[in-house]
Amino acid sequence: TTCFIQGLKNRDDDYSFISLEACPNFYSQAKKYCEQSLSDKIQILHGRIIDDEELIKDSKEPQHSDFLKTDRNNYNTCVNVWDEIKNQNFDVVLLDGGEFSTWAEFKKLQPITMVFILDDCKMLKNKKVVEELNSSSQWRLVKASNKRNGFAIYERV
């Protein structure tokens, strides 16, 4: 979030930046840390774009059950803002969200997004996204790395 804000705040064109955070603690931290940069153009919202029933729930990893419980609890603390943003087109979307929500978020955002930046590509949350983008003729891999948990950037062709 900070990197995006630093890159945008000196621009004078008509842009909009929205960061969504479902976790109340992360939302509070982000809002406090970025407080000086927030404006009509730069917003951090405590919200989500999918509902509980859209979360991945069939992970075979035992440790995932605790993470899923936490994600579901976080979802109960915030509102779904999809109806407020679904008619926008996004130049860039960074998918670095929840382990169990990212696939459903990607499916909603894919038709209205030009560039996806994916963090943690080797993890559950973005593995399936990478597979879909790699197999599609509508998307081109711009950059990828296997360092840490991996990242990738895809652009609509």
Predicted segments with their positions:
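S-adenosylmethionine/decaboxylated-SAM
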Residues: T1-V157
